[in-house]
Amino acid sequence: SVIFVPPKFAKAAVIDAIDAKMPLVVVITEGIPVHDSAFFYAYSLQKGTTQIIGPNCPGLISPEQSNVGIIPADITKRGPIGLVSKSGTLTYQMMYELRDIGFSTAVGIGGDPVIGTTHIDCLRAFQDDPDTTAIVMIGEIGGDAEERAAAFISEYVTKPVVGYVAGF
């Protein structure tokens, strides 16, 4: 399920998707109240059937295979890089810059205070993915998600990782 509704309807739309046992819900909507995001994220954990990506994210793409969200498919190709990013704009920019190398999967997780899928979730998936040989991780200032991801990388990730934290 892909959620494109206005912020005031997003909570109900995500709950409907979780109740329908959708395995993946990508929440593109920006401006969702933090309380609503916290509620539907906790609800998804309680139900245990749905993985949430976002909110306030561009989605995810495995070039030449699938695209869920608003990531333009024509800026990249299939390749060995796994990309996880909080920033939609930097997701697109990185995909464009590395277009000649290509991506196994790129995931825009969103930069809101409460998100579903995290850097660590994606790092774990890329580590386990035989089609991914290197990882690019893009973060933003605020919070400690990038620090937790760095600790996870040092302990569990054997593939090369390039990290960038935007902002100052």
Spans of model-derived segments:
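Catalytic-core regions of core metabolic enzymes
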Residues: V2-F168
